[in-house]
Amino acid sequence: MSASSDFYRLTHKKFLYNITHIDNIPSIIQNGIMSFDDIKHMSHHSIAMNDVQLRRDSVLIPGGDRLHSYANLYFAFHNPMLYKRQNIAEDLCILAFSCDVLDIKNCVVSDRNAAASLAKFYSAEEGIRNLDFDKIFAQFWIHDDPYEQSNHKAIKCAEILVPHCIPYDYVVAACVVSQNAEQRLRNAGFDREVSINAKVFYR
């Protein structure tokens, strides 16, 4: 059984997600979602936090390459990264990718934010059987115990990592916060289904 079919069997979910700036859409249409290393010399509007990128720069994937040489998606779009960027919601879109991405050669998954000190990395096939999807897809990650909250926050950001690039062909749909954002997305050339849902962006 493939990693994507295992994922659907265990979660009944079909999509994986990337949160990006609408200005990046023309590049994504042409080049796909690219790794940090592959895109750093190109014009790109990053929404990543500098301290997070510094941590990611030092992470090595066991048996693989640098974390920054992998393009990444999330299992859950409703996560701490989106929460932290709610102030620029009008500039963001959430891209939904087919879970078939999990079947791309050398795909790796992390059981939490890949830059977290406790992160474990697995092949896609093995990882799907080891991730805590109850916590990944939980609506909230706030806990009375600070350690449990920190741990759950990292788990919410479990990642799918693909060497270098995830082609645009895997993109199925997008979600934005408003009609204005939808128009910007269309003007950027996006040609897939678009939904508008302000609540997704904590509005």
What are these regions (language model features)?
Residues 1-72, 78-203:
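Active-site-proximal loop/hinge segments that shape catalytic or ion-binding/gating pockets
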